[in-house]
Amino acid sequence: MRFLFLLFIVFPAIEIGIFLFLGNLIGILPTVLFMILTGIIGAAAAKKQGTEVYYKVQRDLQYGKMPGEAIADGLCIFIGGLLLMLPGFLSDLAGACLLIPFTRGWCKPILFKWLRGMSKNKRIIIK
């Protein structure tokens, strides 16, 4: 329940505050253009990296390897691309962290821990 409160009340309020602050600091037009630009860059980066991960999964499967790492990368890229396309500066920061391979390495253990927790709680079943 606290997570939903943060997601739907606190997070948008912080985003609106950042919009207002930057709108006053650099102006409305640059702020809006920056949001549009991050959405376009996010979509392009997610498409490029997503295609690379797709080929990596195929290659791993051809060699008989489990593509777990590549699938985790793909999930991070997908979520990162979505976050970059959402309007907001915090979501852009989180999305960029998921798209940059160096910082994605920090996020993947959190993703794996969350998935293991979901599996243990029987919320998702991994077979």
Swiss-Prot record:
Q: Does the keyword Transmembrane helix apply?
A: yes
Which cellular compartments is it found in?
Cell membrane
The keyword Nucleus is annotated on this UniProt entry: no
> One GO CC term of this entry?
plasma membrane
Q: Report TM segments.
A: 3-22, 26-46, 70-90, 93-115
Record key words, sorted: Cell membrane, Membrane, Transmembrane, Transmembrane helix
Q: What membrane topology was assigned to this protein in its record?
A: Multi-pass membrane protein
At the top level of its lineage, which domain of life is listed? Answer: Bacteria
One Pfam annotation reads FxsA
* PANTHER family for this protein: UPF0716 PROTEIN FXSA (PTHR35335:SF1)
Q: Give the record's family classification.
A: Belongs to the UPF0716 (FxsA) family.
User: What is the protein name for this chain?
Assistant: UPF0716 protein YtzA
- Please tell me the species this chain comes from: Bacillus subtilis (strain 168)
